[in-house]
Regions:
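Conserved class I S-adenosyl-L-methionine
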Residues: 31-95
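Short catalytic/ligand-binding loop motif for oxyanion handling, primarily in non-cytosolic enzymes
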Residues: 9-10, 40-44, 148-153
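Rossmann-like AdoMet/SAM-dependent catalytic core
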Residues: 84-383
Length: 383
């Protein structure tokens, strides 16, 4: 079961009901994914949400939009921060608040309303939510943000303190505090883990991986919630070179690279996190191609009508890949006019949607042409 972006935006009784529904619906060993805003990362946003909610309530009978209430609250808070050279007590206590307020003008209005104009808005702590989940026999298993499962990737100055903690829940708390965690993507399992270590290893070694979108690069920096992680270029390039020949199992990769299971799991997790590698679904992926093509056709139509859908379903990996509105316009232009210049179609399409490019049309078209072959391998068709 999946509950993405719900738990921290609803009242406590509804949050407990979500957990109960998950627990009652899953068989033993079934998985429940739940993502939510968390503390301490959202502390700086608390004053903004408080004022935005009050502003929206005060303006409820007027004609201004809910998004305007958020911007009005932000303007008021700016006046409470003082100057950068002479910050107020609030600005010193919440140094991230000024930057957050400055970023609002770049955010979509629908997101601002959904995020801040919400009576049930309440960033959660990991210990409180995990305790609530355990009360429903939902046991924390792992983070869907794969790098978060490897505390050895933490910066050196905080790593030892986190890894020295033996209690799993306390270790999660320490990790969240150390990195100022703002959003968790937790996976829970129903009941107890019935797999032995040998069974877990066998399942892992049988998994197959494939090259996804992996343009050549000299270095391997990975942006994670721990900060920037720099991978060993020779090692990561070797993995991609092997996978360029086609999908490979974990066991084969381990043998060819002479890596331990934990080390290879970390390498693959970072490549998966960065979208350079995918989990190959084999025959199941082939069987899902037609359905994914149908979904992509609908997503394309909605995207071209201005809806905020910026991903496409990729059947071979059972996941989604980014696909911008500019790429959707160029894809449609190519289907309608073959190999002619699509610059005009791109510009007109963006103008009609009230959108602009951050780069030149020529650069965007060149990037799309370079990406088309990689996308074709992922079978991102529309039928």
């Amino acid at each position: 079961m999946v509950a993405h972006g719900i738990a921290a935006w609803v009242a406590q009784p509804i949050r407990h009901a979500l957990l109960k529904v998950a627990a009652d619906s899953l068989i033993a060993g079934g998985l429940y994914y739940c993502s939510y805003n968390t503390l301490p990362g959202w502390l700086a946003a608390c004053p903004l949400q408080q004022l935005a909610w009050l502003e929206s309530r005060r303006r409820a009978s007027g004609t201004t939009s809910a998004a305007q209430a958020v911007h009005a609250a932000a303007a008021t808070l700016q006046g409470l921060l003082g100057l950068a050279e002479t910050p107020s007590a609030l600005a010193m206590a919440l140094p991230g608040l000024r930057e957050r307020l400055g970023s609002l003008k770049e955010m979509d209005s629908s997101y601002l309303v959904q995020e801040y104009i919400n009576e049930g808005w309440q960033p959660l702590t990991v210990q409180d939510f995990h305790d609530s989940a355990m009360a429903h026999k939902l046991r924390y298993t792992a983070s869907a943000a794969l790098p978060d499962n490897f505390p050895g990737l933490l910066p050196v100055n905080i790593r030892d303190t986190v890894m020295a903690e033996a209690d799993p829940l306390v270790r999660e708390v320490l990790q969240d505090l150390a990195i100022n965690q703002s959003f968790r993507r937790d996976i829970f399992s129903r009941g107890v883990d019935t797999l032995s270590s040998a069974e877990n290893t066998a399942l892992l070694q049988a998994m197959h991986f494939c090259l996804q979108e992996a343009p050549e690069q000299e270095s391997y920096p990975f942006t994670t919630s721990f900060g920037l992680v720099n991978g060993n270029s020779n090692l990561y390039r070797s993995v991609e070179t092997i996978l360029a020949d086609g999908p490979m199992s974990f066991a084969v990769l381990q043998d060819r690279l002479s890596l331990s299971i934990p080390d290879l799991a970390q390498v693959l997790s970072l490549l998966l996190h960065d979208g350079r590698v995918g989990i190959d679904r084999g025959e199941a992926g082939k069987a899902a191609t037609s359905a994914c093509n149908s979904v992509n056709k609908t997503l394309s139509r909605l995207q071209l009508n201005g809806r905020p859908y910026n991903f496409r379903a990729a059947a071979p990996i059972g996941s989604a890949v980014p696909f911008s509105i500019a790429e959707a316009l160029l894809e449609t232009a190519a289907e309608n006019s073959g190999g002619s210049d699509h610059r005009e179609a791109l510009i007109k399409g963006l103008d009609a949607l009230g959108r602009t490019l951050v780069d030149t049309p020529e650069a965007v078209m060149e990037a799309y042409q370079q990406r088309r072959y990689r996308l074709q391998k992922l079978e991102l068709g529309r039928s």
